Design a protein with these regions (language model features):
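Class I S-adenosyl-L-methionine
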Residues: 1-173
Length: 173
């Protein structure tokens, strides 16, 4: 959704408030385990609130061993908890500035670059069917073409969930 709309903001606040429920961990695990997809991204908006929230995420990951989890974050304090991180969770520290180098002190990171090239995450040119369009084709697309194709999908790429991929670079948009 578009985060400027009140209905979306209200839903975000409800999700935040739900973290206080003692049923949250079990409910999240049930929902994740019921999905066909075996990858899960935490937070399309927002971040880890505090240590209790992080521990709940760890608990959900432990209850969903068949799912690979990815947690993007800008919360540097989380680094102290990396030794406790479940094996099926990749925590990527996001560099806060465009064209900033990946923080060397984190095992897995993400960066944003002002250049679009084939080394970047292909989501910006991947449509809803999973087709990855070439850079050349993308550069010729109109705004309307891009909207119709519904670009911005992962397709078959799973780099964000792969702990062997040290940094994922996203093109600025």
């Amino acid at each position: 959704g578009c985060y400027v709309f009140k209905v979306v903001q209200d839903a975000q606040y409800r999700r935040l408030a739900s973290l206080q429920s003692p049923l949250w961990v079990g409910a999240m695990a049930l929902l994740i385990n019921s999905k066909k997809s075996k990858v899960f991204r935490w937070h399309d908006s927002g971040d880890v609130q505090d240590e209790a929230h992080l521990m709940k995420i760890f608990a959900v990951c432990k209850l969903t061993p068949g799912t690979r989890h990815w947690l993007p974050t800008r919360e540097a304090w989380i680094k102290h908890f990396l030794p406790e991180c479940p094996d099926n969770l990749v925590i990527r520290f996001s560099a806060p500035m465009v064209d900033q180098d990946a923080p060397g002190s984190w095992p897995t990171t993400s960066t944003v670059t002002s250049s679009h090239n084939s080394e970047n995450c292909p989501a910006f040119r991947t449509d809803k069917t999973g087709t990855v369009h070439t850079l050349e084709a993308f550069d010729t697309m109109t705004k309307e073409n891009k909207k119709d194709l519904d670009l911005g999908h992962c397709g078959s790429c799973r780099n964000c969930w792969n702990p062997e991929v040290k940094n994922v670079a996203y093109g600025q948009h």
